[in-house]
Design a protein with these regions (language model features):
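Exposed low-complexity, polar/acidic, P/S/T/G-rich flexible segments that act as propeptides
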Residues: 33-62
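Extreme N-terminal leader/anchor segments
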Residues: 55-126
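Extracellular beta-strand ligand-recognition surfaces/modules
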Residues: 5-43
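Extended interaction regions within the primary functional domain
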Residues: 26-30, 39, 46, 50, ...
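A surface/extracellular/periplasmic glyco- and lipid-processing/surface-interacting theme
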Residues: 28, 51, 243-247
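Aromatic-lined, polymer-binding surfaces characteristic
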Residues: 103, 107-366
Length: 366
């Protein structure tokens, strides 16, 4: 249940498309009972963004033939992957100790001495504008639409991922540091509403390009709220949403040698992947996910060919087809944090991966 954006270009629609003079359309219902509501139904005159996102609703959407699609838009394709790293039947005492060490390092990194009042105030201000409340029927919500930035009309007060981030992070800080029960309640109201609006497992929200820049604090503050999330009846929906939008599913397999836009992934979603992996309630699944993530990151740190993104044999870092030192500083910092979190454990990166990181630092120094 909930609203799901479905964007698709004519070229990716099914059926006979020899005649491009469209005169009508049909909606064909599946052979089962249910109700569907249509809203914001448009037929764009201007060309749609090429980065329409295949998802659970329209998995055949988009040929994904452009390099700048090989990142944000592949979340559903990656969801079809399975781990080839087996789930351990039980963890050794050493593995349990390592996970606790990593958990404490992450907590120490993310905690602050006191609640930051600015983000809390911003969360409440945005929440007031969002005007979220249960629907009259009691089966959903009413409130401000939350949509992808491409269709967002800010003049009408419509919101997007950055507003979800503002509300969730603000309420998380207040609930965690000040034990504010109202903020705790608001946190889960916003999370439920975000899922209702399409920030959910299996949804691409029409187009999800560049969303990683607008969701980072959703993850860092979800870590602070993890105990409350674990106890909530909607726990599985929250965790599956976090994992899906972190693109943790990509790390069920090693990184493809031809994968482009790696700097974007490291910079915006590596921390999200890490936190999602650490938030499995079952420690065995944590170990499996963390093993997959470390393997994926190590393999992504291989020297990449040509002009695709990543680290080159001379240590230079490529993004958008060229050397991009201005973007690299934040990227290397994020990867460096992951190295620190897993240092001295069986989940640390390979020696080759760390050597390649070192070469990137040296190239930046020069």
């Amino acid at each position: 249940a909930g609203w799901r954006a479905c964007w698709i270009g004519f070229q990716h629609m099914k059926g006979n498309k020899q005649n491009k003079e469209i005169a009508s359309y049909r909606l064909i219902a599946p052979e089962r009972k249910g109700r569907i509501f249509l809203d914001r139904l448009t037929f764009p005159v201007k060309k749609m963004n090429d980065r329409t996102t295949p998802d659970l609703q329209i998995p055949y959407n988009n040929s994904l033939s452009y390099r700048d699609l090989w990142h944000w838009c592949l979340v559903w394709k990656w969801e079809q992957q399975s781990y080839d790293i087996p789930l351990p039947s039980k963890l050794t005492s050493e593995q349990k100790k390592e996970l606790k060490t990593i958990e404490q390092r992450l907590t120490d990194f993310l905690e602050v001495k006191k609640a930051p009042q600015g983000p809390i105030n911003a969360g409440y201000k945005t929440f007031e504008k969002a005007a979220i409340s249960p629907s009259i029927a009691g089966t959903g919500f009413i409130g401000t639409p939350i949509v992808a930035p491409d269709e967002q009309d800010k003049k009408k007060g419509e919101m997007s991922w950055n507003d979800i981030e503002t509300m969730l992070s603000g309420f998380a800080y207040d609930a965690y540091y000040n034990q504010n029960e109202t903020s705790k309640k608001n946190y889960f109201t916003v999370f439920d509403y975000a899922i209702d609006q399409g920030f959910a497992y299996g949804s691409g929200m029409g187009t999800n390009h560049h969303y990683g820049y607008q969701v980072r604090k959703i993850y860092t503050t979800a870590w602070l709220m993890r105990d409350a999330i674990y106890k909530h009846p909607h726990r599985d929906a929250y965790l599956s949403t976090l994992r899906f939008w972190a693109a943790l599913q990509e790390t069920r397999q090693p990184c493809s040698p031809t994968r482009d836009e790696l700097l974007d992934s490291w910079h915006t979603l590596l921390m999200a992947k890490f936190i999602s992996a650490m938030m499995f309630p079952d420690a065995r699944e944590q170990a499996q996910a963390l093993s997959g993530l470390s393997r994926w990151l190590s393999s992504s740190l291989r020297y990449t060919p040509g002009t695709i993104g990543g680290i080159k044999v001379d240590g230079t870092t490529f993004h958008h087809g060229g050397f991009y030192p201005g973007y690299t500083t934040g990227v290397l910092a994020t990867v460096g944090e992951y190295i620190a979190f897993t240092n001295g454990t069986s989940f640390e990166l390979t020696e080759d991966a760390r050597k390649h990181m070192k070469s990137a630092f040296i190239a930046m120094r020069n």
